[in-house]
Amino acid sequence: MKERTYICCDLKSFYASVECIERGLNPLDTNLVVADLSRTEKTICLAVTPSLKSYGISGRARLFEVIQRVKEVNAQRQRNTPGRQFTGASSHDPEVRRNPSLALDYIVAPPRMAHYIDWSTRVYSVYLKHVAPEDIYPYSIDEVFIDATSYLQTYHLSAREFARKIILDILQTTGITAAAGIGTNLYLAKVAMDIGAKHVPADEYGVRIAELDEMGYRRSFWTHRPLTDFWRVGKGYAAKLEANGLYTMGDIARCSIGQPTDYHNEELLYKLFGVNAELLIDHAWGWEPCTIADIKAYKPENKSIVSGQILQYPYPFEKARLVIQEMADALALELVDKRLATNQLVLTVGYDIENLKGTAYTGEVTTDRYGRKIPKHAHGTVNLDGYTSSGEELLKAATSLYDRIVDKTLLARRLTLCANHLLDESSVPEDLPEQIDLFTDYSAKEKQKKEADTAHARERKLQETMLDIKKRFGKNAILKGLNLEDGATARERNNQIGGHKA
């Protein structure tokens, strides 16, 4: 089989770069964060420019962390300033570094998600100038994989030259700088970009490109820490591995070839991670058999639609119940729009840390990703009588499930509602034949069925009318009464994409 060459391209601090460019500023030397100031200081920063990151600020910091770190930097600068007084402040980083009498400042830009999607489309059009769509896999709004194998000979370029050609075209067309990782498989390309490119000096255009093959990966990254730097290794995975004495990808690779009598062997990994251990072992060795063609050809056995949100503040039982009803109603409209039906709902409600402050809560406690103690989330499933996209039925089922699984005394913060086992409406099975008995009034039953069918048809017509109005005049052009109640979130979320301002 011919060895393939993959390129993983990532737009540097994409949202922040867009905001800088539109202000006529250089994204590489302007201190800017993209965050919603209308929320609390706990709001997450969606992007941070490279110059601001250089002060020790994470790319996904909370706004209060940015504020705190900038205060620390300025306190240190002020101690070294003549007269210990600043003469001004600047968000232009070279100016700040040249002039010790200036305070470090930064711009807070509100997110504009729809605008970033437009910019992402512009960047994608640049990729299409060089590569056919079947050889591109958009991994996220600011990241793509490219199968460059067949293009290197066509363009008479090396993989590095081809990647640089694309990146410079993006820079010239949009003003956005990108980084790239090149690998002999998708995993190695991703690792080269995520980890390798960070340690490569930037060229005169700020471009960083790193390359990896299997042996290079083992030489350079088998001892790399932390494990969470690697693709698909989250904090939970890393904690399990480290609890069992596995701290690096090299440790995992050695564990996978351990003898049955050894503590560290392949069986341990399967015991810890089940079938996912196979992927972890492959990645430890730098293997990845999946291709872009495989990804595009993949058809999941089960389909689902998930709706989730983090509430702006802790909600009591009744208010969170209202939001769940909104979510169920919106989920039904999405099913109608996509001509799908579901027969199962899954609900998860995450509780807030406030529940453990000065209360007599004695239930099960767990730890969140920040190491804070919180009550264990509520989780439940309800199977419907049949496949449906009826808002009335889904709202009733979701409300009943919520009432059954949620602790009425606790404050909710995270809500997730999932419609499972989706089928195209044309594929929904007919009602199964029924065993006749002597004690059922079938005429009354038939009458009930006709009335239900009429009600469903009437509701369906109403749903389709609402969808038509929303598409033509905006999602908030028509609302239900529950969307206007205190605590409802649908109106605000209709103006958002991914939970942030559109």
Q: Which residues are covered by each model-predicted region?
A:
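Acidic, metal-coordinating catalytic segment for phosphate/diphosphate chemistry
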Residues: 18, 371-502
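Short, well-ordered strand-loop elements centered on a beta-strand within folded domains, enriched
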Residues: 42-47, 207-210, 358-359, 377, ...
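Gly/Gly-Pro- and Ser/Thr-rich, intrinsically disordered tail segments characteristic of DNA damage-repair
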Residues: 1-292, 443-502
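Residues at or immediately flanking beta-strands
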Residues: 177-179, 346, 416
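DNA-contacting surface of Y-family translesion DNA polymerases
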Residues: 8, 229, 237-412, 427, ...
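Short clusters of hydrophobic/aromatic residues that line enzyme substrate/ligand-binding pockets
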Residues: 209-212, 227, 305, 382, ...
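Short, charged/polar surface micro-motifs in flexible loops or helix N-caps
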Residues: 12-14, 38-42, 351-356, 422-426
